[in-house]
Amino acid sequence: MSEYLQQIAKRRTFAIISHPDAGKTTITEKMLLFGNAIKTAGTVKAKKSGIYATSDWMEMEKQRGISITTSVMQFPYNGRIINLLDTPGHEDFSEDTYRTLTAVDSALMVVDAVKGVEDRTIKLMNVCRLRDTPIVTFMNKFDRDTRDPLELLDEVENILKIKCAPMNWPIGMGKYFKGVYDLYNDEVTLFETGHGHEIYPYKKIKGLANAKDAIGIDLYEDLEMEIDLVRGASHEFDEQEFLEGNLTPVYFGTALSNFGVKEMMDGFTRYAPAPQHREADQRVVAADEQKLTGFVFKIQANMDEKHRNRIAFFRICSGKYEKGMKIFHERTGKQMQISKALTFMAGEREQVEEGYAGDIIGLHNHGSIQIGDSFTQGEKLKFKGIPNFAPEIFKRVKLNDPLKMKALQKGLVQLSEEGATQVFKPFISNDLVLGAVGVLQFDVVAQRLASEYNVKCSYEGVNVTLARWIFCSDEKKLNDFKKKYEVNLAYDGAGYLTYLAPTGVNLQLAQEKNPDIIFSATREH
């Protein structure tokens, strides 16, 4: 195998999906620890000590302990190159997370074993199922009193409609948690408390019978019965079914104590797929093609406090990036030279000399790159992506200093280009209406406007409950519609016509009266 093909085969690009507080940030830290990317893992709880989760680098994230922005972390493990896309963990940040799932080849689902399958996990799994993304599952928090593990497997199968294949099995739970039993290698790994910040060589005992004294006779007898039950009732691991997105290998442990994470990572790097082919409008692009192709799935403003720049997160789909190369920007039809692409470590940026399929690199962006843009080495090719989603909550922006209107508009357009929030300019007023998927996003925007653009603003209620993008191929009918409904119409930050409805009934009536107008809840980038 050539060096080029070896580099592609090494890549594992994935994201973690979970409900808030299921332990995603903690497990991210432990992975970075195993990959020698950080020296000690800072638990999210230790906010007062100034130890912050490495992936939570924006100021508000540090204060609240939540992962608002998607950062990208690359590190080596087991002879693989891991590209971990950190996804926003808090409930409010779903749209960014959805888009991130377009840039991965597999996903790790973290389930809080105390609570079971939760709402956010269901929504994220639905996005993964659209592309049949292979899923590995980690049942977390077994150092607490959790739900019954068999119940948890049933719940995953029934709610998420995916078969479960347990790879190991927990021995007890909470204060009686003794470790895990490897169902495929007949090996017990014994749990000890107090090793969450380090890589610790937990004791292993080969052969279940040899672990009887270490785990105690009562737990041993329970475990024997459970294992018989599990072997009879659950699915065996099948690699093909996993790669097709129909079956998930399940690992048990506790990320906070760094227990069970290594076993999961070993399994993940062994089974998760290398970079996969990608669908474009014109054709399917194979990962091992020689020419560089890729797409932008996120734009982040001001990752560097010293510079008011923007970084476009670019997923390489094929070919090799080399420093200084020229690429073709499909949307604008222009050539672009990339002299200083970046690789990321959650806010720490390094220039990258080369990149392969599966890698995420950062392109400096001075306003010309948008989410969903495709780049090639000359071919007219547009990758299919996940669109903008209509916001669900709306507020009017109230400016404290009217002289700062220009700075406010610039800041809001930049923030909307990141895809984290959306801004609308109504036809008949000078108002700026902000739309988001969740409430906390408004706090993020206000704080970033203050710290990055020196603009202080507050919010007022606005008589908008729904937004729909307007499309019509008949120019005359579209112009008539604009005149008739100008009180409800606005342009979004990218200049697309949008209908802002005060009520669901209002929207329904407008749709019924205008059958030739398309009212869309999504907009392709």
UniProtKB/Swiss-Prot annotation:
The keyword Ion transport does not apply. Keywords: Cytoplasm, GTP-binding, Nucleotide-binding, Protein biosynthesis. It is found in: Cytoplasm. Transmembrane segments: none annotated. CDD domains: RF3, RF3_III. SUPFAM superfamilies: EF-G C-terminal domain-like, P-loop containing nucleoside triphosphate hydrolases, Translation proteins. It holds the Pfam family GTP_EFTU. GTP binds at residues 18-25, 86-90, 140-143. The keyword Protein biosynthesis applies. One of its GO terms (biological process) is regulation of translational termination. One of its GO terms (molecular function) is translation release factor activity, codon specific. GO terms for cellular component: cytosol. Residues 9-276 form the tr-type G domain. It comes from the Bacteria. Belongs to the TRAFAC class translation factor GTPase superfamily. Classic translation factor GTPase family. PrfC subfamily. Increases the formation of ribosomal termination complexes and stimulates activities of RF-1 and RF-2. It binds guanine nucleotides and has strong preference for UGA stop codons. It may interact directly with the ribosome. The stimulation of RF-1 and RF-2 is significantly reduced by GTP and GDP, but not by GMP. This is Peptide chain release factor 3. The gene is prfC.
